[in-house]
A protein has these predicted regions:
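Short, intrinsically disordered, low-complexity terminal/loop segments
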Residues: 1-4, 161-162
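Bacterial N-terminal signal peptides that target proteins for export
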Residues: 3-20
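C-terminal motif of bacterial Sec signal peptides marking the signal peptidase cleavage site
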Residues: 29-32
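Compact, glycine-rich, soluble single-domain proteins
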Residues: 34-162
Length: 162
């Protein structure tokens, strides 16, 4: 065996160990979003906060997708910029506070203007376009998930702005 062949062989073993460690870490991270085999498998995407027109209140929007075989429930949201974050549903000119919202199995729950939203009462700092808000979503069955929501311009709509 040549010196070059030996060198590749010895560096191959540590590389294989490192790959195994990285793969096992990734598996743990993905399982943290589920309640186990046959349970919900949640993913959050598209989180954003439109720059508020008033310094007293802001709203957060996102989508939760459950690719698992069981439903779950969103039971609460906290935000790093507000002592009080409340889930609401707007419909027919009214708004009502909700304590939990179902996330259907093999379905999605969308928070968007005119429907579900998280009301961020009295932000502790002024929110400007380009800032970020950390949201932590709590579920009945699945582990809590933290997402980073960028502050977008007033009137921002993901389907038309990107």
């Amino acid at each position: 065996m040549t010196a070059i062949a030996r060198r590749h062989r010895t560096t191959g073993a540590p590389a294989a160990v490192m790959a195994a460690v990285l793969l096992s870490t990734t598996a743990v991270t993905l399982d943290a979003c589920s309640a186990g085999p046959g349970g919900p498998r949640l993913r959050v995407s598209g989180a954003y906060v439109p720059r508020p027109a008033s310094p007293d209140v802001a709203a957060a929007y996102f989508t939760i997708v459950d690719s698992g075989d069981s439903a779950d429930e969103l039971t609460g949201v906290t935000a790093d910029v507000s002592a009080q974050a409340m889930m609401h549903q707007s419909a027919a000119g009214t708004m009502r506070m909700l304590e939990r919202i179902p996330v259907p199995a093999h379905g999605r729950l969308t928070f968007a203007p005119g429907g579900y939203h998280v009301m961020l009462e009295h932000p502790v700092r002024s929110l400007r376009q380009g800032d970020h808000v950390r949201l932590t979503l709590r579920f009945r069955r699945s582990a809590a998930m933290t997402v980073d929501a960028p502050v977008e311009p007033i009137g921002y709509r993901p389907e038309t702005s990107r």
